[in-house]
Regions:
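Helix-to-loop junction immediately C-terminal to a conserved catalytic motif
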Residues: 47
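Q-loop/switch helix immediately C-terminal to the Walker
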Residues: 76-92
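Conserved ABC ATPase "signature" region
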Residues: 90-105
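Walker B catalytic motif
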Residues: 109, 138-139
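Conserved ABC ATPase signature
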Residues: 109-113, 117
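Hydrophobic anchor residue at the start of the ABC signature
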Residues: 123
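ABC-family nucleotide-binding domains
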Residues: 137, 144
Length: 187
């Protein structure tokens, strides 16, 4: 995937100017920057969700799966129902929930979960979907260090051989996910 952004602005605020990067296929790439530097905007452009910019994104596939910063879950239904709504098999949902330490919470309403648990449900949704590219925006928000390590190992295993782009402000996330390439914005 080749990204060439001549200009991206919100009103008179220029977010990107003459930004070029290449994302290698089949590996995990990591984009790191402080809060407010446009990581989420860049991720949305690469995933094809933001077309309001000057430039090009050359991509071999439009089959993109995105983990947003907001969990985007249905709060009033169970964890398992949130996953089954994707049209996936219940046994696959149970397997992913088990790997994300959420099996015991499968029948609870999402509204009853902590922020970290909700983040893991959002990750489960992404990991159950089949795509060519995965774009993960701050995937470990609200997770403690031990949970991060376990989940990073599972994500790396589950998405092995896939193109994965992760944006975060935390350098350690790159190491946890075994990123092949790291791009640092704002230096």
């Amino acid at each position: 995937m080749k990204v060439n952004i001549k200009k991206k602005a919100f009103g008179s605020d220029i977010i990107f100017s003459d930004l070029s990067l290449t994302i290698k296929e089949g590996v995990t790439s990591f984009i790191m920057a402080p809060s407010g530097w446009g990581k989420t905007t860049l991720l949305k452009i690469m995933a094809g969700l933001d077309n309001d910019y000057e430039g090009t994104v050359e991509s071999k596939s439009d089959n993109n799966i995105v983990l947003f910063q907001e969990n985007r879950l249905v709060e009033g239904i169970s964890v398992l129902s949130n996953l089954k709504a994707l049209g996936v098999k219940e046994e696959d949902s149970i397997d992913v929930l088990s790997h994300l330490s959420l099996y015991e919470e499968r029948n609870k309403k999402v509204s009853e979960l902590s922020g970290g648990m909700k983040r893991r449900v959002a990750l489960a949704r992404v990991l159950l979907l089949s795509g060519d590219r995965y774009f993960l925006d701050e995937p470990f928000t609200g997770l403690d260090d031990e949970c991060k390590r376990e989940i990073a190992f599972y994500i790396a295993k589950k998405l092995s051989g896939k193109t994965v782009v992760v944006v975060s402000h935390n350098k350690e996330d790159s190491l946890l996910l075994r990123a092949v390439d790291t791009l640092v914005l704002g230096e």
